[in-house]
Amino acid sequence: MADTLPPLSLYIHTPWCVRKCPYCDFNSHEPGTHGFTPRDLPEAAYLDALLQDLDNDLNLVAGREIHTIFIGGGTPSLLSPAFYEQLLKQIEARLPFADGIEITLEANPGTTEQERFIGYRKAGINRLSLGIQSFQPDQLHALGRIHSGDEAITAVTQARQAGFSNIY
């Protein structure tokens, strides 16, 4: 039955950023304004909320395969690899993943490190959007970005070393 139904794509929003970029119109909030830091986000509560939201709409997509998942934000790379491992496992338990599913995570070069990239890859994420608008310090400052050009280059290198080949 899944072969006759149109493919399904899923967007998952992460509403937190270390700092809100002045050009960003997306729903995102700085964690400090809510009493927690970027490294102690309420992951368990957010996971429960996302799964409850999915469960509420499962009847609308019954029998369909997910072909793509895009995790945007905000800054999804603020959440741990363990969070995404659980999230993806729970989604797949509810809806089948197509062979060759593409799972994208937006990541800010200022919030990543080698271990996180390795963990994201192990969790099932196979595509990264690194959000590198520039390598020039003056442009990065004007854009309100939290990373430097060197950090952007390091992030690409670390992502490749972690096994990511689909990076943009």
What kind of feature is each model-predicted range?
Residues 1-11, 62-64:
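N-terminal [4Fe-4S]-dependent radical SAM core
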Residues 5-6, 21, 41, 95:
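Intrinsic-disorder/low-complexity coil detector
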Residues 9, 22, 103:
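Divalent metal-dependent hydrolysis catalytic cores, especially in the metallo-beta-lactamase
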Residues 11-13, 129:
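Structured core elements
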Residues 13-28:
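Local cysteine-cluster metal-coordination motifs and their immediate loop/turn environment
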Residues 28-60, 65-168:
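Conserved non-cysteine loop/helix-boundary elements of the Radical SAM core domain that shape
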